[in-house]
């Protein structure tokens, strides 16, 4: 039998079950000894029976019990060696918890020691134990996800450990120097490590501060993933369990002397003790706050690589990286900013629009047509819709979504869409489209939907309402996801149709209601109301994960790129099957729109690529600049199509690279609708800067430039857009 081979078998549970039984037997023995008052029990057990069952032993026992049960339901897949080692560690932690008083007695007992000597020994013991708790906590967080743990850079390692230690010390003093506070901290660190593990496995990314506001959304879509624990997670939990066991050794030395011997009965806390401990907690808490606020960790070199946050977390440590990310949540005012300056820059761009674009014959024709008939505007943001053929046809002849690429030759325009998220973060692409604001000027690491109030901010539904449009948002999932219910209200949508507005037996595919179900809802809106409609539909069926295994065999694609693992290619084919299904539903939808006796313009785009695309990108595209290499991962597709002849437009399916922040302005410009000053400025900016996302912008020379590149030929324009974004959005936030 190979003890190092990963296995998934109920028999694995026998190992932790045996250790749990041994721990329980020791627990029973100690309890009986305490009742009898025999020499088997430490002196401090005799007066208080409950002291033989501290939480320091309870938590390891519960952990062993969980490990014994989880293999029976397929939630642990690990090696025998790992299970044996982790179970032994948990058992040892439980033994420490059970015998904590005897251990402390052995370490601190000295009948001839003075009070000062006892205090010193006690303080030294607590210091050593706290160091052990912090060390266990560090490994509890890092081990589950950090495959390069030995490579954590030294300067950042020390800061990371310090940031981790401060909360432990605060809880130590708040708990009057007892075990509970540090023990709870260790458990919380273990939970964080487990969360990091799952996010690494599911999304190939790390937990960012903004994710805390999106926790409800994560929970709502959590059902599509496999939560099997493997070696890294199991070892991390074992470390957390040992931390709890070590923490049980903490406790104040509150004994006097009786007949020259240590008194077994602890003395009660005095008011002075409580005040001193609380004062120490307050001082440590102040240091903790200062450590989170005062140093600018980005300037110290701990800047997060938002292209790949996981890399930064592994190099700098999870806690330091998380704190650095929290400092990025603030939308910083641009340098040399003033409202007057930003307004002047906006007016200058509007003047350029009026001079260079407003008089265009095609625009004039579209304006005249719009005055006579306002087309309904339908926008579909399709979950994870992208054309993976950009990866050299996946080196297996993949041509991309067939109808999308070849079935709408009469579209107004189509092309690549440069988005700001990968593998998740759908709401940020939504935000960019509906507000026209690029994440490039808000800063990285934010989810605006989750943290801002949009009541006083400009948004497309409000703009179209002034033109007589009724607006509807559709998303076939929970309305609380990404805080959409409140956000859509703030943006001015008249109604929001969520999963609650669809039949329980509505057709499903992969991870949600089919795209077609939402399209039928849109068609119903268009048929039942003759007034111009603005409908924004966020689909769900293609949502990750892609190892669900629920695609019918006759609909499952079979592309096998060479040099890539079979597991990754299995993910690819489940994903491509979803894209194929979406493509078929899109063909149906376009066919139905053609039958309508009313003008409709359809804007269809993908929110982001799948997270595993990086496997192919890294394997096949080497030697590129980091920016150009990563931008491939942040590219989806869009099309703008109409079921009527748009005046002034050849409808020749022009290939036009763009971004979600520009797309609404492009749409309104194409159909002849009135434009806001900001949209006019965007259209002027597009002439120089065709595409922009959170990481950079594309020049007319075909090169990508980083957003903070002051030497780029577009740095001046980028600075102007930064000012204008702050003027019209950031300063209006509540």
Residue ranges and their predicted role:
Residues 2-313:
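Transmembrane and membrane-interface helices of multi-pass
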Residues 103, 136, 218, 319-322, ...:
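Generic structural signal of hydrophobic/aromatic residues within well-ordered alpha-helices
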Residues 351-371, 381-382, 386-734:
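Solvent-exposed soluble domains appended to multi-pass membrane proteins
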Residues 33-45, 254-273, 340-341, 354-371, ...:
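Intrinsically disordered, low-complexity coil segments
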Residues 290-379:
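Membrane-interface segments at or immediately adjacent to transmembrane helices
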Residues 220-223, 232-236, 342, 346-357, ...:
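Membrane-proximal soluble helical/coiled-coil segments
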Residues 212-215, 315-322, 339, 343, ...:
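Alpha-helix initiation and N-capping motif
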